């Protein structure tokens, strides 16, 4: 298979298995040596596949071990983890009936979350429930995504598109920590998280807004939104890596692109932060050329 086809197939396999897998497990689905597979993943880069070395816990099955994988440094056995990443997004303006064609997916956001009241009779919904329309197929093709079914695309979007997260509280994002200007505090029905972090744009290494997506206060909100916790964990892993990468780039005084050696360093540095982000919250809760681009974030 040509490399773009291989990458698309790898994304399909990853999303059929929850959006992330150990490298050794992914290897079982392709006729490539481990060295060749790693080369494909590294060439595609973290914009497509996030490849990180993590510490595993012995005595667990593959699925349990993958879910429990954390930062390297605890003295346990390490393995390489692969997370599916994509810049494909749902179009925000389409949700409001304001866009006919652009470089983002024209698909019902509520249906993607399994919450559209017309999901059993999609012809009564004014928004498309079909990922195979000409517009959507062109968008997927431009992102190098071929052959994904709706469930696989859903997994990919859930762990990459901030549009599908609960609505972020804007009052929380203003004023001082702990709650900003939000008087509802823990009773607020909006997401108390750094708005810039979920968009991959937070420039602060030490931010007074929360970068933790999963904690006791947010668990019910996430579940009510129709999100599964593994997908949110994947979003956390990807966002933590992006935050560290952005901060490192801002520190680079000559504004040059990070070197290969620097990027490899982020593979390990990023997983330390992501591992810590996973461990804390989870432990505290019950276990085209002429088309005009649209804004990235969804307005609800």
From Swiss-Prot:
- Give the modified residues of type N-acetylalanine: 2
Protein name (Swiss-Prot/TrEMBL): Zinc finger CCCH-type antiviral protein 1-like
In residue numbers, the region (Disordered) covers 252-300
Which PANTHER family does the UniProt entry name for this protein?
A: ZINC FINGER CCCH-TYPE ANTIVIRAL PROTEIN 1-LIKE
The membrane spanning regions, by residue number, are none
Q: Cite the entry's keywords alphabetically.
A: Acetylation
Q: Where is the composition biased (Polar residues)?
A: 252-263
Q: What GO cellular-component annotations does this UniProt entry give?
A: cytosol
Gene, per the UniProt record: ZC3HAV1L
> Taxonomically, which superkingdom?
Eukaryota
InterPro entries linked: WH-like_DNA-bd_sf, ZAP_HTH, Zc3hav1-like
Q: Where is the composition biased (Low complexity)?
A: 271-283
